[in-house]
């Protein structure tokens, strides 16, 4: 059991039989009345966000999770399929519970979160940055580098990323999987 004072981002809670990750939390101490905690929780199975307010000091059920490395294999109608590199065990995770799934490509290593006691697969976490090749983008105008203008570019996974005008087709770029933003060009 944990109290609201123990809340931190990424913590997993069990509420009414459902598993939730804390996305954001804020301790509020109003001038009048008792303190409380506002949280934004993400449902592990559906991916939906829930806003919940807790009275300060309330006890909640914390879920112990283990992080295990898995390799992405392929996608089918059941979801996304991963394989453990040592045991070759294969698992399927629904796409709704994976953040940044549009940046996932064959062979990528991810961290799969597993319930420590029941061995239930909860979700997976992509690395914060991935290197992807640009497959399509409009050509930039020569000499148009004075402004910080961005243009849409399609990467090898099919996702669309906003990139600077100087990026061309075939270039390797680094993308932040948390918000889908362009980080920089990768030297080959």
From Swiss-Prot:
Named in its record, the pathway it takes part in is: Protein biosynthesis; polypeptide chain elongation
- The protein in question is named Elongation factor P 2
The principal location of this protein is: cytoplasm
Q: Which InterPro entries match?
A: Elong-fact-P_C, NA-bd_OB-fold, Rib_uL2_dom2, Transl_elong_fac_P/YeiP, Transl_elong_KOW-like, Transl_elong_P/YeiP_cen, Transl_elong_P/YeiP_CS, Transl_elongation_fac_P
Q: Which Gene3D superfamilies does the entry mention?
A: 2.30.30.30, Nucleic acid-binding proteins
Q: Where in the cell is it found?
A: Cytoplasm
SUPFAM superfamilies hit by this protein: Nucleic acid-binding proteins (SSF50249), Translation proteins SH3-like domain (SSF50104)
Q: Which GO terms describe its cellular component?
A: cytoplasm
Organism of derivation: Porphyromonas gingivalis (strain ATCC BAA-308 / W83)
Xref: PROSITE patterns: EFP (PS01275)
Sorted keywords for this record are: Cytoplasm, Elongation factor, Protein biosynthesis
The UniProt entry, under HAMAP family, shows: EF_P
Question: What's this protein's family per the entry?
Answer: Belongs to the elongation factor P family.
- Described function: Involved in peptide bond synthesis. Stimulates efficient translation and peptide-bond synthesis on native or reconstituted 70S ribosomes in vitro. Probably functions indirectly by altering the affinity of the ribosome for aminoacyl-tRNA, thus increasing their reactivity as acceptors for peptidyl transferase.
Q: Which domain of life is it from?
A: Bacteria
* GO aspect biological process, one term: peptide biosynthetic process
Provide any one GO MF term from the record.
Answer: translation elongation factor activity
User: Do you know which Pfam families this protein is assigned to?
Assistant: EFP (PF01132), EFP_N (PF08207), Elong-fact-P_C (PF09285)
């Amino acid at each position: 059991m944990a109290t609201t004072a123990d809340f931190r981002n990424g913590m997993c809670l069990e509420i009414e039989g459902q598993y939730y990750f804390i996305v954001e939390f804020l301790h509020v101490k109003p001038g009048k009345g008792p303190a409380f905690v506002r949280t934004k929780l993400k449902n592990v199975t559906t991916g939906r966000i829930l806003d919940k307010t807790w009275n300060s000091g309330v006890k909640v059920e914390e879920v112990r999770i283990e992080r295990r490395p898995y390799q992405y294999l392929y996608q089918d109608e059941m979801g996304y399929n991963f394989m453990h590199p040592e045991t070759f065990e294969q698992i399927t995770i629904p796409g709704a519970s994976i953040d940044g799934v549009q940046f996932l490509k064959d062979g990528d290593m991810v961290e799969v979160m597993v319930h420590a006691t029941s061995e239930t697969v909860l979700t997976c976490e992509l690395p914060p940055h991935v290197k992807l090749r640009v497959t399509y983008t409009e050509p930039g105008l020569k000499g148009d580098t004075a402004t910080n203008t961005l243009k849409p570019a399609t990467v090898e996974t099919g996702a669309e990323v906003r990139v600077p005008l100087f990026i061309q087709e075939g270039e390797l770029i680094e993308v932040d999987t948390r918000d889908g933003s362009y980080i920089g060009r990768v030297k080959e």
